[in-house]
Amino acid sequence: MASILVGSILGTVKDQLVQSFSAHSPRGRRGWRWAIWITLVSVLVLLVVSEVVIRRAGPILKGRVIETLSSRFDSKVELDDLQVSILRGLQVSGKGLRIFPPDDVVAAGAKNPLIAVQDFNFHAGLIGLFLKPMHVGVVHVQGLAINIPPRQMRGQGAKKSRHEGKIKILVDEIVCNDSRLVIDTANPDKDPKIFELEHIVLHDVGPNAPWPYDAKLTNAVPKGEIHAAGTFGPWNTESPGDSTVTGHYTFDHADLNPIKGIGGILSSVGDFKGQLDRIEVQGTAEVPKFTLDTANYPMPLYTKFSAVVDGTSGDTYLQPVEAKLGQSQFTCSGAVVNVKGQGHTVDLDIDVPAGRIQDFLQLAVKTEPVVMTGVLEMKTKLHIPPGKQSVSQKLGMKGNFTLKQIHFTNPELEDKVDMLSLRAQGKPKEAKPGAEDVHSRMTGRFQMGEGKLDLQDLNYAMPGATVRLAGVYTLDGKKFDFTGKVRTEAKLSQMVASRWKSWALKVADPFFHKNGAGAEIPVKVTGTNGSPKFGLDIGRRDSKQ
């Protein structure tokens, strides 16, 4: 191409000079003859130099790129192709750039390149080719992949003194599209931690200083856009996972609905710092209309959290999270654990010091209105295993609770509880529908899973009586099935208003008067939330007799 260009230019120059030469006198022609030859020789020299520059620029720059990167990362560097053009300054494009881990890390088993680039290009002034170091304004990168080997591999080789070679190229800014950061793990039960970076810009890229960056990525689950800005580096050559990273992030409009069993739009902001292997995060998150599919009742959920992301395992440790559901505040701590090929397991310890039971029932139980209101104290362990099932079906909880100031929203059930309290105190004449609500307290152990709530050692105390129950309550509100005993202060004969019924029951008093109680009566609660049935469980008592 250069030869054709040289021939064309020389031919054109010659034709123009010959025309001018023919128009002058013989004496003038001798002067023009010399001018023609001097011009032709000058043009020829210029074009020969240009052709040499074009031919040599590629190898020169390829050598500089490899030498600069090899010096910076202290490792082997490969570059498949480098193309150079000088028609509009110095334009460079390359393909297949690979930077490998240090030799001792490769010997320990690291096989993938530490850094791989599909394509890159940059533009610089032509004079820069002859300067050392060469200055480049912006480098555009497509398909950047960074693979951080497991910490165990990075620790195999002894640390050695680095030879700081001369940097042959200085870059102001690197613009990367479609990048991926992979932090590998040596644990066979874990998947590597992967960050997909849609767009990232690195500023002031120097060898021994942090690089300011601005990044944008689309989170897969829940799907939403994350924007982060901060600093990265300096790059730790011996152990890349220990390279420092800091920043501030925003996570907007993350749709929870594709996650089976839950719904809502998540937003989060926060700050992070640490190393690639271990990043500390502090932030807030909110879902104004959070739902579980067992109820589909939207509840506002807000959290303030502190977490550690372990890049070596892919696990996230929460320590702790301050949360608010509706008007109920609680804390939780625990871990989101990476399970190879399956997803994550969530294990949390939850502490509700003084919440509202109605907030939790509205979220989880498909009944309107909720069964009861009251003040909830609860300590529980929450477990969500990986899998494709609905979160509500996978969700498991186990713990204990205390309920105070209980009020049943079903008027019929509340009346029965209030009248039971009055009869148990020996005030049967006051036991009428619409009686004043009694102050009651409930404690117990529970286990929730597979869409049902299993209650054990349920102790319901009210003036004049204590109710001890155990049984199952389905979260869809379609089934109550509890059995137990009511222990009262009054005897059976003292619980009825009719005098003749009272005399008749005196015969039965000795059979129910036991263990220090006026009466101990077997009871059952069955039915549904809309139609509960509260009555004696005489058959069960008879079978035990």
PLM feature segments, named:
Residues 2-74:
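N-terminal type II signal-anchor transmembrane helix
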Residues 47-150:
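Terminal hydrophobic membrane-targeting helix
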Residues 68-72, 129-134, 141-142, 146-149, ...:
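Membrane-proximal interfacial segments on either side of biological membranes
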Residues 75, 82, 90, 95, ...:
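Residue-level detector of beta-strand structural context in well-folded domains
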Residues 96-99, 213-220, 319-325, 456-462, ...:
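Short beta-strand segments that buttress and anchor functional surface loops
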Residues 212-215, 251-255, 289-290, 315-322, ...:
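Transmembrane beta-strand segments that form the barrel wall of outer-membrane beta-barrel proteins
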Residues 439-443:
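Generic long, charged, amphipathic alpha-helical segments
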Residues 446-454, 458-470:
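Extended serine/threonine-enriched, polar tracts that run as long, contiguous segments within proteins
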